[in-house]
């Protein structure tokens, strides 16, 4: 450019209003021409003609001069590119700055061959290895791309159309993870733990019937063996809770019917009453031997020495006393006796009176109520119509008084004396205080309803007043019986000297007077 300016610069004499400069002045102020050596050797034929375009444009360069189409297998190109290889490939991860001249002013050169063609050429000729010297356009980008194909893991087939990069390779390595996740999902610890937790209750349920069957065999009776029934608490047979009896009402009814049939057959064979309280000592011994033979228990030779009581006293013995006298068969005998008592208590009152009229009733001396002249019957006790004056005679029964006549029904009502006298009215009936002591004599059955607090002093407590009232109403065949009526009868005993209030007044706690506490 400086040279062209010098060619077109006019002479000093031609410039208007320019002072004449001397040669020594020009040399002093003008620097030495740096292009003088180039001007001497410059070939003017290289300058463009007048019809040509401006020399500063780059349109003079044609695309075929840059892109060498037939230089792929030429050895001279390899020789020319060998010295430049160290310069062009110092590092595969560095970028060369753009050229100094404005690159945007020039048209972009033609694109290099496609990556697929370039890869096919490299793999076909060099067996998969890349040679930077044989590249048609040895640029940094091409060298970097080909090196990444060998350094990084291969891309999946669907990504061959894109330029591989470290980021894309990492992305495809992540895509392969779902396959491992699918394989690992075959072993799910949560599902295994859940299955184990579900199987454990089933195992318990599977083993439970075995233990339950063992209990049934240990606590079984003849009726349960025949009908394969589960053992029930004896409380449910004689009242118990209302909901328990409601659920097992059919089973209870069937069991009582079976017990009644067995009792009828044994009573007909032994000529005894169904009420254990009416048995004599000889009848007690006959029933014990029959029960031992029925359940195939060891026979007892001296049975009369072990049990010398009559039926009423036998009914008051506890299970511990039975076991103490007969360790091998005492528990079974006591359980069978309780079943007989329940079967008899479930019968209507008129059947009980008819059965008792055919047998004698023997109460022990401690239960023998002294002679009382009463002008009331048992039903009037429940209705709070007790207006009579009770006169208690000596315990030996030496003095007696004629029985009083009940004006309401025209019959006589007398209480049994210690000498075993019969009661009037065609049959005997149990009194409330006797019934309470009968319940107290069976704590295994009635312990949740009534219990002793101090047996020596005759103090007891009614734990379940509703249940005691129901049992008393069943015994007297009075379905409308409740505890209010029963408590009125108990208060009447205060006037007769049969019961009294305790020293420390407590609710539902009562005390028998002497000799009724014995």
Curated annotation (Swiss-Prot):
Compositional bias of kind Polar residues: 84-94, 158-171, 396-412
One GO BP annotation of this record: regulation of transcription by RNA polymerase II
Organ and tissue specificity: Transient high expression in pole cells during embryonic stages 8-11.
CDD domains, A to Z: SAM_PNT-PDEF-like
Location of the PNT domain: 258-344
UniProt KW Lipid biosynthesis keyword: no
One Gene Ontology CC term in the entry: nucleus
Ranges of Low complexity composition bias in the record: 102-113
Pfam families attached to this UniProt entry: Ets, SAM_PNT
SUPFAM superfamilies given in the database record: SAM/Pointed domain, Winged helix' DNA-binding domain
PROSITE patterns xrefs: ETS_DOMAIN_1 (PS00345), ETS_DOMAIN_2 (PS00346), ETS_DOMAIN_3 (PS50061), PNT (PS51433)
Subcellular location: Nucleus
InterPro entries given in the database record: Ets_dom (IPR000418), ETS_fam (IPR046328), Pointed_dom (IPR003118), SAM/pointed_sf (IPR013761), WH-like_DNA-bd_sf (IPR036388), WH_DNA-bd_sf (IPR036390)
Region (Disordered): 74-113, 152-172, 393-426
Alphabetized GO MF terms: DNA-binding transcription factor activity, RNA polymerase II-specific; sequence-specific DNA binding
Spans traversing the lipid bilayer: none
DNA-binding region (UniProt annotation): 430-513
Its job: May have a role in germline development.
Family named by the database record: Belongs to the ETS family.
Name of the protein in question: DNA-binding protein D-ETS-4
């Amino acid at each position: 450019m400086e040279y062209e300016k010098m060619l077109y610069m006019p002479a000093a004499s031609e410039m208007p209003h320019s002072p004449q400069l001397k040669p020594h002045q020009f040399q002093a102020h003008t620097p030495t021409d740096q292009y003088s050596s180039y001007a001497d050797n410059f070939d003017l034929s290289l300058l463009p003609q007048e019809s040509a375009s401006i020399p500063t444009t780059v349109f003079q360069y044609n695309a075929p001069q840059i892109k060498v189409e037939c230089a792929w297998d030429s050895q001279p190109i390899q020789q020319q590119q060998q010295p430049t290889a160290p310069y062009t490939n110092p590092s595969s991860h560095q970028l060369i700055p753009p050229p100094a001249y404005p690159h945007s002013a020039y048209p972009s050169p033609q694109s290099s061959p496609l990556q697929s063609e370039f890869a096919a050429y490299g793999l076909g000729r060099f067996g998969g290895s890349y040679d930077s010297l044989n590249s048609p356009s040895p640029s940094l980008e091409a060298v970097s791309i080909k090196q990444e194909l060998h350094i990084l893991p291969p891309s999946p087939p669907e990504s061959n159309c894109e330029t591989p990069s470290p980021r894309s390779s990492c992305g495809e390595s992540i895509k392969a993870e779902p396959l491992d996740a699918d394989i690992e999902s075959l072993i799910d610890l949560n599902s295994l733990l859940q299955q184990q937790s579900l199987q454990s209750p089933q195992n318990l349920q599977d083993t439970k019937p075995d233990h339950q069957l063992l209990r049934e065999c240990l606590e079984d009776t003849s009726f349960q063996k025949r009908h394969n029934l589960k053992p029930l608490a004896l409380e449910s047979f004689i009242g118990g809770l209302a909901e328990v009896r409601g659920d097992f009402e059919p089973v209870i009814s069937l069991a009582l019917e079976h017990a009644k049939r067995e009792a009828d057959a044994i009573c007909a064979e032994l000529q005894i009453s169904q009420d254990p309280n009416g048995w004599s000592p000889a009848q007690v011994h006959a029933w014990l031997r029959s029960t031992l033979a029925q359940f195939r228990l060891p026979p007892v030779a001296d049975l009369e020495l072990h049990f010398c009581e009559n039926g009423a006293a036998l009914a008051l013995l506890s299970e511990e006393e039975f076991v103490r006298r007969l360790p091998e068969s005492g528990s079974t005998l006591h359980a069978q006796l309780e079943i007989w008592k329940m079967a008899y208590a479930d019968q209507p009152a008129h059947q009980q009176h008819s059965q008792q009229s055919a047998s004698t009733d023997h109460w022990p001396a401690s239960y023998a109520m002294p002679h009382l002249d009463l002008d009331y019957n048992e039903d009037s006790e429940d209705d709070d119509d007790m207006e009579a004056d009770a006169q208690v005679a000596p315990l030996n029964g030496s003095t007696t008084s004629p029985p009083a006549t009940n004006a309401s029904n025209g019959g006589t009502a007398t209480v049994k004396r210690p000498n075993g006298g019969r009661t009037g009215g065609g049959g005997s009936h149990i009194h409330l205080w006797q019934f309470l002591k009968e319940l107290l004599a069976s704590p295994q059955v009635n312990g949740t309803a009534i219990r002793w607090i101090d047996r020596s002093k005759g103090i007891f407590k009614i734990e379940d007043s509703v249940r005691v009232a129901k049992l008393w109403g069943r015994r007297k065949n009075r379905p409308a019986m409740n505890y209010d009526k029963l408590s009125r009868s108990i208060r009447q005993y205060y006037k007769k000297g049969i019961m009294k209030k305790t020293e420390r007044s407590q609710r539902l706690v009562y005390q028998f007077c002497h000799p009724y506490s014995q």
